[in-house]
Amino acid sequence: MNFENCFPLWNDLNTAQKKIISNNLITQYVKKGTIIHNGNLDCTGLLLVKSGQLRTYILSDEGREITLYRLFDMDMCLLSASCMMRSIQFEVTIEAEKDTDLWIIPAEIYKGIMKESAPVANYTNELMATRFSDVMWLMEQIMWKSLDKRVASFLLEETSIEETNELKITHETIANHLGSHREVITRMLRYFQSEGLVKLSRGKITILDSKRLETLQRL
């Protein structure tokens, strides 16, 4: 799988721009748990996931994590290069949720091409708008949706991503995704278990009734 076949703007670049990217492109393999980008002090560049899974999250003043969005195969991330856009002051951390192969276009290289190419600039603005729309949707969920519905939604999302009803995940990890406390998540999961929705075991959650979880998240 070549970068040229995966980068959606490749055919919109001229020969010189393609050469600049090819000469500066970074190929990186990161293991699960690796922090790839850490706040505004980093200016990693534009990320394109070749294979794997990344998680973009923020930290509250109390040190709690909350997941903004995840990145899968062929997804691009611009917030890792937000330093090239002065109007954006958004401190995010990007972590590998699975072993991941990715490409990185250094921020200064991408910024230079964005100034030269209208298609690149337009695509960048559209992608950034999409990401901020995702974040705004998440904020609405946090403000207006009860925790039981958010936990149900998260469990269903995980079963879809992992393609299994047996999730190898800790209560702490769920809390980090949802911006909650581990103890609160544990109480909610125990309630789900008492209702026959899930089965809990050490480091694992088995979904027993996905239809009722779907109904719960829609209420």
PLM regions: where:
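Glycine- and acidic-residue-biased ligand/ion/polar-headgroup-sensing regions
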Residues: 33, 44-57, 72-74
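Short alpha-helix-to-loop micro-motif enriched in aromatics/charged/Gly
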Residues: 61-68
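Cyclic nucleotide-binding regulatory module and flanking cytosolic helices
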Residues: 1-31, 71, 76, 81-85
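Cyclic-nucleotide recognition modules
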Residues: 69-125
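Short phosphate-coordinating micro-motif centered on Lys-Gly-acidic
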Residues: 36-41
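Polybasic "coupling" helices that flank or enter modular domains
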Residues: 97, 115-180
